[in-house]
């Protein structure tokens, strides 16, 4: 595909007028003000503005299914009375369709990549593979039991399996993070063990910090 004589906002904010942008194999293969040689297939000409895609740096994308479920509640009531009980009933199939819905909404608004933390992650991976978007995906991990270690949690086995099977998948569009849910839902020793797992695989960590006060509404 070739975009001809379009205006391009570049990643550094610079403006390129009457530009040509060539796409091959799903990637930008040419950017310049001279028409590139060769056959680029379909051509879209003029009166277009091309901008870099947006990156959504924190999502729980299957939670599109919970939109509007528990408005005007304090954070603790929203989580404990609505969200956690609802999530206990979710299936992998629910997570897959909720992910596809959220991904469709992101793509429609120009978001090309997102960073997600949830569970049934293999179904989120499936939705990402099928949709063409890019994503960092992590198995969200929390622990309220003072006697269980990280290795004893189901999330540990899930995280290792995700790292083994999905990191670098979909032609490199999918990366895997190690994802403690938040500092207030995960003990310090488990956070340390998760950091060690991330270091073992050379991947990033993704967590929630600076959470709103329990008194504030969501």
Model-predicted segments: where are they?
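Metal-coordinating catalytic core of metallo-dependent amide/deamination hydrolases
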Residues: 124-215
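Divalent metal-binding segments
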Residues: 73-120, 183-190
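Short loop/helix-cap segments at secondary-structure boundaries that form the rim of catalytic
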Residues: 33-40, 126-130
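Hydrophobic "anchor" residues on beta-strands that sit immediately upstream
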Residues: 54, 112, 204
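Divalent metal-coordination and catalytic microenvironments
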Residues: 6, 21, 26, 47, ...
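N-terminal metal-binding scaffold of metallo-dependent hydrolase/deaminase domains
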Residues: 1-38, 49-50
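Active-site gating loops and adjacent loop-to-helix segments of metal-dependent hydrolytic enzymes
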Residues: 65-97, 134-156, 213
């Amino acid at each position: 595909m070739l975009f001809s004589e379009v205006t391009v906002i570049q990643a550094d904010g610079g403006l390129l007028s009457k530009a040509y942008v060539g796409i091959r194999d799903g990637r930008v293969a040419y950017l310049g003000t001279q028409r590139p040689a060769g056959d680029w297939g379909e051509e879209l000409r003029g009166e277009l503005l091309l901008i870099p895609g947006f990156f959504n740096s924190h999502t729980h994308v299957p939670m599109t299914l919970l939109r509007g479920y528990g408005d005007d509640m304090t954070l603790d009531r929203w989580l404990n009375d609505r969200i956690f009980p609802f999530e206990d009933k979710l299936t992998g199939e629910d997570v897959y369709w909720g992910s596809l819905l959220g991904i469709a909404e992101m793509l429609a608004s120009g978001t090309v990549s997102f960073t997600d933390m949830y569970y049934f992650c293999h179904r989120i991976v499936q939705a990402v593979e099928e949709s063409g978007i890019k994503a960092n995906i992590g198995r969200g991990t929390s622990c309220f039991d003072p006697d269980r270690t990280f290795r004893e949690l189901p999330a540990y086995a899930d995280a290792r399996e995700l790292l083994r099977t999905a990191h670098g998948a979909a032609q490199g569009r999918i990366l895997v993070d190690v994802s403690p849910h938040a500092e207030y839902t995960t003990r310090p020793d488990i956070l340390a063990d998760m950091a060690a797992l991330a270091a073992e695989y050379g991947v990033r960590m993704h967590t929630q910090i600076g959470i709103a006060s329990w008194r504030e509404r969501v």
